[in-house]
Amino acid sequence: MSDNDDIEVESDEEQPRFQSAADKRAHHNALERKRRDHIKDSFHSLRDSVPSLQGEKASRAQILDKATEYIQYMRRKNHTHQQDIDDLKRQNALLEQQVRALEKARSSAQLQTNYPSSDNSLYTNAKGGTISAFDGGSDSSSESEPEEPQNRKKLRMEAS
């Protein structure tokens, strides 16, 4: 952003050539005042954009220092959030892959269970316990204990 952005400045070329030296000086002073006011307003806007400085009095050097710190903080935070997003995308892809594998296993298990057995409503799970065909293979009883929401855990993936 240059000093001339958002400022309407009249050039000296538009003025009649017969201006006195005093008129030229007054015009130049007015342009300089506009430029300084624009810079002042820009610093106030920057100060109000930095959370630690909002509404406080601060020198221009302090405003620039705090703005620099805030930008660096936001960059680090953005980088961390981007890493979290990437981790969640990888975790989501893994979970989708597991869902597809489980659906495939379930469909192949259903093909095997189509053959008559003595009691097809009871099966054994991987731990050797008896489960009902209707509970989906869960080891916990959802009737006796309310299910507590599980905290989301980060999935650590090793590079392959």
UniProtKB/Swiss-Prot annotation:
The modification N-acetylserine is found at residue 2. Residues 1-13 have a biased composition (Acidic residues). Residues 81-102 are annotated as: Leucine-zipper. Residues 29-40 have a biased composition (Basic and acidic residues). InterPro entries: bHLH_dom, HLH_DNA-bd_sf. Residues 23-74 form the bHLH domain. Its main location: nucleus. The modification N6-acetyllysine is found at residues 66, 153-154. Keywords: Acetylation, Activator, Cell projection, DNA-binding, Nucleus, Phosphoprotein, Repressor, Transcription, Transcription regulation. It is found in: Nucleus; Cell projection, Dendrite. The modification Phosphoserine is found at residues 2, 11, 107. One of its GO terms (cellular component) is dendrite. Phosphorylated. GO terms for molecular function: DNA binding; DNA-binding transcription factor activity; DNA-binding transcription factor activity, RNA polymerase II-specific; DNA-binding transcription factor binding; DNA-binding transcription repressor activity, RNA polymerase II-specific; E-box binding; identical protein binding; protein dimerization activity. Residues 107-124 have a biased composition (Polar residues). GO terms for biological process: cellular response to peptide hormone stimulus; cellular response to starvation; negative regulation of gene expression; negative regulation of transcription by RNA polymerase II; neuron apoptotic process; positive regulation of DNA-templated transcription; positive regulation of transcription by RNA polymerase II; protein-containing complex assembly. The keyword Transport does not apply. Belongs to the MAX family. Efficient DNA binding requires dimerization with another bHLH protein. Binds DNA as a heterodimer with MYC or MAD. Part of the E2F6.com-1 complex in G0 phase composed of E2F6, MGA, MAX, TFDP1, CBX3, BAT8, EUHMTASE1, RING1, RNF2, MBLR, L3MBTL2 and YAF2. Component of some MLL1/MLL complex, at least composed of the core components KMT2A/MLL1, ASH2L, HCFC1/HCF1, WDR5 and RBBP5, as well as the facultative components BACC1, CHD8, E2F6, HSP70, INO80C, KANSL1, LAS1L, MAX, MCRS1, MGA, MYST1/MOF, PELP1, PHF20, PRP31, RING2, RUVB1/TIP49A, RUVB2/TIP49B, SENP3, TAF1, TAF4, TAF6, TAF7, TAF9 and TEX10. Transcription regulator. Forms a sequence-specific DNA-binding protein complex with MYC or MAD which recognizes the core sequence 5'-CAC[GA]TG-3'. The MYC:MAX complex is a transcriptional activator, whereas the MAD:MAX complex is a repressor. May repress transcription via the recruitment of a chromatin remodeling complex containing H3 'Lys-9' histone methyltransferase activity. Represses MYC transcriptional activity from E-box elements. This is Protein max. It comes from Rattus norvegicus (Rat). The gene is Max.
